Amino acid sequence: MEKILVTISTGAASFAVLAVLFTIPSLYNTINEVHDEVLDGVSVFRVETDSAWTEMMDIQITVTPPTKPRVNPFNSIFRQKRQTFSGLPAWCQCEPTKPTCPPGPPGPPGQPGQPGTPGAPGPKGEDNTSTYAPITCAPVSQDCVKCPQGPAGPEGPAGPAGPAGPDGQPGAPGNAGNPGSDGQPGAPGDDGQPGAPGQDGQPGAPGQDGQRGSGAPGAPGAPGNAGPAGPAGQDGAPGQDGQPGPAGPAGQDGAPGNAGSDGQPGAPGGPGLPGNDAAYCACPPRSAVFVSRH
């Protein structure tokens, strides 16, 4: 029985070793194929992202010209802290871009935490040694509860009108009134008829001769009406040229001209250094040097 178990175990172990020997080369080839596919995909992704970034930079340069980078005015006063990146390869010795964006809004409150561990039990309380007088309750009354008088209610509506009273006694006669005031004078009467004409009087005696007057001449009379227009005169000689007037205000600026044509593409850069396995460092952000090349 033991020989049979040893034989079966030996056969199973031999089969497992043979299966591993046949599986390892296939697994190694599969890993190499996956590695090559990943490298090809990363290369294609780099080419596509670089081309997309180049197009975006060309569009941005066409629409808005590049501006000068912002310079901190305190850099010349305060010394910047040095940073060391000795742990990175030689081609990664570059200072990372410092974030200049303002902090974002605070995030939503997190989930409530787990309940804390229960505290240690407190010390045992002291025994009560004081005594109290017995409490005697008043006897419960069986009479009805007398509530206090409530506030006055609202005023009721007005009642109906009562019957008419009897007529009163006649009053005493009044005193005589005062005489009235004089009225306004009346309007004047109409004019009477004209009287009959009287008789002609006797002619008067002839008057004495008058003195010849020697008064000053009267004021000149008003000017007469304008006479007809005379014939047109000959044209006068041309006058001399006047002095030149002051310079007018400057005109408005003209519209901006059309954008210039794109420059010639720069020479391609040299190939980069190969990276170590599992030590690929992140690509630096696009800088002004990259924009100037493209």
Curated annotation (Swiss-Prot):
InterPro entries: Col_cuticle_N, Collagen. GO terms for cellular component: collagen trimer. The keyword Nucleotide-binding does not apply. Keywords: Collagen, Cuticle, Disulfide bond, Repeat, Signal. Residues 164-209, 219-265 have a biased composition (Low complexity). GO terms for molecular function: structural constituent of cuticle. Residues 1-30 form the signal peptide. Residues 100-112 have a biased composition (Pro residues). Residues 100-134, 148-278 are annotated as: Disordered. Residues 102-127, 153-274 are annotated as: Triple-helical region. It holds the Pfam family Col_cuticle_N. It comes from the Eukaryota. Nematode cuticles are composed largely of collagen-like proteins. The cuticle functions both as an exoskeleton and as a barrier to protect the worm from its environment. Collagen polypeptide chains are complexed within the cuticle by disulfide bonds and other types of covalent cross-links. This is Cuticle collagen 144.
